Amino acid sequence: MEPIEVFKALSNESRLQILQWLKEPDRHFAPHEGIDMNTIGVCVSQITDKLKMTQSTASQYLTILLRAGLIKAERIGKYTYYKRDEEAIGKLADFLKTEI
């Protein structure tokens, strides 16, 4: 994980909001076809609906978070599910504690 890329990813309010929502997906999203959102993640269409923006914009935001290493993606059938990468977020917290 590159700290500059992480900070760039988090500098957008909507991307930060996505990361916050994914911390407690059951609280922020309706269930999706029997998927355990805490284990598998949240479908891009659910994130798009909650953001009230186009799927292409939401997908761009998710790609930026993915490239920064803050989230993981898993494709199941025709859907892609996203969840936080807790290990990477823990490393970011450690970086902030020790380096800044």
Curated annotation (Swiss-Prot):
Q: What is the lineage of its organism?
A: Bacteria, Bacillati, Bacillota, Bacilli, Bacillales
Q: Where is the HTH arsR-type domain?
A: 1-100
Q: Which InterPro entries match?
A: ArsR-like_HTH, HTH_ArsR_DNA-bd_dom, HTH_MetalResp_TranReg, WH-like_DNA-bd_sf, WH_DNA-bd_sf
**In the record, what terms sit under GO molecular function?**
DNA binding; DNA-binding transcription factor activity
What GO biological process, any one, is recorded here? regulation of DNA-templated transcription
Natural source organism: Bacillus subtilis (strain 168)
| Ranges annotated as DNA-binding | 44-67
Under the heading Gene3D superfamilies, the entry gives:
Winged helix-like DNA-binding domain superfamily/Winged helix DNA-binding domain
* Pfam families in UniProt: HTH_5
Provide the protein name. Uncharacterized HTH-type transcriptional regulator YbzH
Sorted alphabetically, which SUPFAM superfamilies does this protein's record hold? Winged helix' DNA-binding domain
User: Which keywords, in A-to-Z order, does the entry hold?
Assistant: DNA-binding, Transcription, Transcription regulation
Does Transcription regulation appear among the keywords? yes
Q: Can you tell which superkingdom this protein's organism belongs to?
A: Bacteria
